[in-house]
Design a protein with these regions (language model features):
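ASCE RecA-like P-loop NTPase motor cores
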Residues: 1-231
């Protein structure tokens, strides 16, 4: 209290802050609204540039036919492992296997590592050596298989043919936690104050937090595949 009652020196701000530019390959989800909201930016000039990468001719999206088991069912793990084995066999290695949980990563590693090594593929597992060493060995080998979780979804770049396949086990929705739950409660209150009602209010946090965050993570993970115009 004594400190709060001390006289303050008035500070006059006479200089206009310089412009700030935010640049990223993954900010738009699909527009800039979520990023601006999270940063507290009320107004800004935005631009979404066309990608220089030829995804249509240089990449292919594979989604397994038919309905998969729910990720919370025991059958999902074996279904996932079977799909991974088929795809890695087809690509002959050069694969990032990106998992949304350590449990799925460990299950896949235990089931597939021996088979892949018998095929002559180098298997690298997150946690068995430093991240930089794993990335270097993957690039140098050319036909390796990486088993990894969130830390390899971003910040790792493998160019050319050393990486030919990226597999993501399931949609990377954020798990409940104190901070994430608090953000959802805040969004619910915000929506209610804006007059949102009924099911629109019920789904507002999911549509405006869960989905944008998941979309950003998915773009980060899938973005490991095409890194240059040569890929």
């Amino acid at each position: 209290d004594e400190w709060l009652n001390q006289p303050r020196t008035e500070i006059k701000v006479t200089r206009i802050a310089p412009p700030i530019a935010f640049c990223s390959a993954t900010l738009a989800t699909p527009d800039m609204a979520t990023f601006m909201r999270d940063c507290g930016i009320a107004d800004a000039m935005t631009m979404i540039a066309v990608s220089p990468f030829d995804y249509e001719n240089n990449a292919m999206l594979y989604i397994p036919a038919g309905a998969s088991p729910s990720p919370d069912q025991p059958e999902f793990t074996q279904w996932m492992i079977t799909e991974i084995k088929t795809l890695v066999n087809y690509a002959r290695g050069g694969a990032f296997l990106l998992f949304t949980s350590y449990r799925n990563m460990q299950a896949a590693t235990q089931s597939l590592r021996h088979d892949f090594e018998r095929m002559g593929l180098l298997c690298l597992v997150q946690g068995e050596m430093p991240k930089l060493e794993i990335a270097k060995r993957f690039k140098d080998n050319g036909n390796a298989v990486l088993f990894a979780t969130k830390s390899f979804w971003e910040g790792v770049s493998v160019e050319d043919d050393a990486l030919r396949l990226v597999i993501i086990d399931k949609m990377p929705f954020t798990s409940p936690g104190p901070l994430f739950d608090a953000q959802k409660r805040h969004l619910s209150r915000y929506a209610a104050e804006k007059g949102v009602k009924g099911r629109d209010l019920e789904w507002y946090p999911f549509n405006n937090l869960d989905v944008p965050v998941m979309t950003l993570d998915l773009k980060q993970g899938a973005g490991r595949l095409i890194r240059t115009q040569r890929d």
